[in-house]
Curated annotation (Swiss-Prot):
Protein name: tRNA dimethylallyltransferase
Reactions the enzyme catalyzes: adenosine(37) in tRNA + dimethylallyl diphosphate = N(6)-dimethylallyladenosine(37) in tRNA + diphosphate
Enzyme class: transferase
Keywords: ATP-binding, Magnesium, Nucleotide-binding, Transferase, tRNA processing
Entry keyword Glycoprotein: no
Pfam families: IPPT
Organism: Bordetella parapertussis (strain 12822 / ATCC BAA-587 / NCTC 13253)
């Protein structure tokens, strides 16, 4: 029996996923499962480009505003939530659409998860303190000695991934790259096949321009004030996944007095471009990928046509 197809609308940041999602919802009885590790947080709306109240009124949306910024959320939890929601949406006679750009979540849903050790808050605090003294490039050099394969694919300033790789080395007693080559953990195989409608730019420079324009629009909409509200909370700090989100960590550094606003803006745009590059690298390796030029004037119409072809009769 052929597994039931689940449609994923994916693409790099600023590719226009939200506009396409709303157009699809006008044609089919959809419910959206958001695949985004930032929009899960309450009070983080501007910098995450979270759907507005008006947009949410047009189509049911799941996995938005489900965590306080002080709380954690994992790929394993997303997988469990998404599989539950897919079944519930099917039971209502509606169509689930996975939409977003957190590629680790898609990977977890499709393939299950590797048996890696859980995060250790004390160890993370120790690594962050060392990074504050020495800089992340120094910790990247340390990682290169412990796990050369992982270090080779990470930027010396990729703080989140360097921290996680060092954490795994310490907790597991072996490199993350070795663990990733080992046995998968006991997740049941996904009962579905996944078809990815992939919004990708035909010109990188044009996407970069979009990213800069969008970041400036977020600043104009009040991003600094949004982050200021988070910054005032004593329970939030730069080590949390919420604060490490692109845009938020740069504004946090500005509010800490470490950099000026122009530098924070430049760093935020650069970090968003790097995120888009990683997203595109992952997308290009996906099976059953239908490419749609997100820069085309009729990109939304093309997405609707691709959805019509991808859905089972």
């Amino acid at each position: 029996m052929t597994p039931r197809a689940i449609i994923c609308l994916a693409g790099p940041t600023a590719a226009g996923k939200s506009a396409s999602t709303l157009a699809l919802a006008q044609r089919w009885p959809l419910e959206i499962i958001n695949v985004d590790s930032a929009t899960i947080y309450r009070g983080m709306d501007i910098g995450t480009a979270k759907p507005s109240a008006a947009e949410r009124a047009q189509v049911p949306q799941h996995l938005l505003d489900i965590r306080d910024p002080a709380q954690s959320y994992s790929a394993a939890k997303f997988r469990a939530d998404a599989l539950r929601l897919i079944a519930e949406i099917h039971a209502r006679g509606r169509i689930p659409l996975l939409a977003g750009g957190t590629m680790l979540y898609y990977k977890a849903l499709r393939e299950g998860l590797d048996d890696l050790p859980q995060a250790d808050p004390a160890l993370r605090a120790e690594l962050e303190a060392r990074a504050a003294r020495l800089g992340w490039p120094a910790l990247h050099a340390e990682l290169a000695l412990l796990d050369p394969a992982t270090a080779a694919r990470l930027s010396p300033n990729d703080s989140q991934r360097i921290q996680r790789a060092l954490e795994i080395c310490r907790l597991a007693g072996q490199p993350m790259s070795a663990l990733l080559q080992g046995e998968r953990r006991g997740d049941a195989p996904s009962p579905y096949r996944y078809v990815t409608l992939s919004l990708e730019p035909s010109e990188r420079a044009a996407l970069h321009a979009r990213i800069a324009q969008r970041f400036d629009a977020m600043l104009a909409a009040g991003l600094v004030e949004e982050v200021r509200g988070l910054h005032a909370r004593p329970d939030l700090h730069p080590g949390l996944p919420s604060v490490r989100c692109v845009g938020y960590r740069q504004m946090w550094s500005y509010l800490d007095g470490d950099i000026d606003l122009d530098t924070a803006r430049e760093q935020g745009v650069a970090a968003t471009r790097q995120l888009a590059k990683r997203q595109l690298t992952w997308l290009r390796a996906q099976p059953e990928r239908v490419i749609i030029d997100c820069l085309a004037g009729d990109a939304v119409a093309r997405t609707v046509d691709a959805m019509a072809r991808a859905l089972p009769d």
